[in-house]
């Protein structure tokens, strides 16, 4: 008989929900940088583990911060 493999990928925890963050402020650059790649792109949910609701809030906050000049649109090489 074939043995079944145990274990697998562990589900990622939503950082925003785990830390009870109600409002994602576009001025909180340190928080937003956690969800941006080295190139300045917004990381997807499957990488960060955020819920769909919090991912939408994050996206809006990151885009606002970019327009205000707090975050770069692209990273410098």
Curated annotation (Swiss-Prot):
Record-stated family: Belongs to the bacterial ribosomal protein bS18 family.
BP term (GO), one: translation
Domain of life: Bacteria
GO molecular function, one term: structural constituent of ribosome
Species of origin: Lactobacillus gasseri (strain ATCC 33323 / DSM 20243 / BCRC 14619 / CIP 102991 / JCM 1131 / KCTC 3163 / NCIMB 11718 / NCTC 13722 / AM63)
UniProt keyword Ribonucleoprotein present: yes
Functional note: Binds as a heterodimer with protein bS6 to the central domain of the 16S rRNA, where it helps stabilize the platform of the 30S subunit.
Key words, A-Z: Ribonucleoprotein, Ribosomal protein, RNA-binding, rRNA-binding
Pfam families: Ribosomal_S18
InterPro entries associated with the record: Ribosomal_bS18, Ribosomal_bS18_CS, Ribosomal_bS18_sf
Protein name (record): Small ribosomal subunit protein bS18
Gene3D superfamilies, sorted: Ribosomal protein S18 (4.10.640.10)
One annotated Gene Ontology cellular component of this protein: cytosolic small ribosomal subunit
Subunit structure: Part of the 30S ribosomal subunit. Forms a tight heterodimer with protein bS6.
């Amino acid at each position: 008989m074939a043995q079944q493999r145990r274990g697998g990928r562990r589900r990622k925890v939503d950082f925003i929900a785990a830390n009870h963050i109600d409002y994602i402020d576009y001025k909180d650059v340190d928080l937003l940088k956690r969800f941006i790649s080295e190139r300045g792109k917004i990381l997807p949910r499957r990488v960060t583990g955020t819920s769909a609701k919090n991912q939408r809030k994050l996206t809006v906050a990151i885009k606002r911060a970019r327009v205000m000049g707090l975050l770069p649109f692209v990273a410098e090489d």
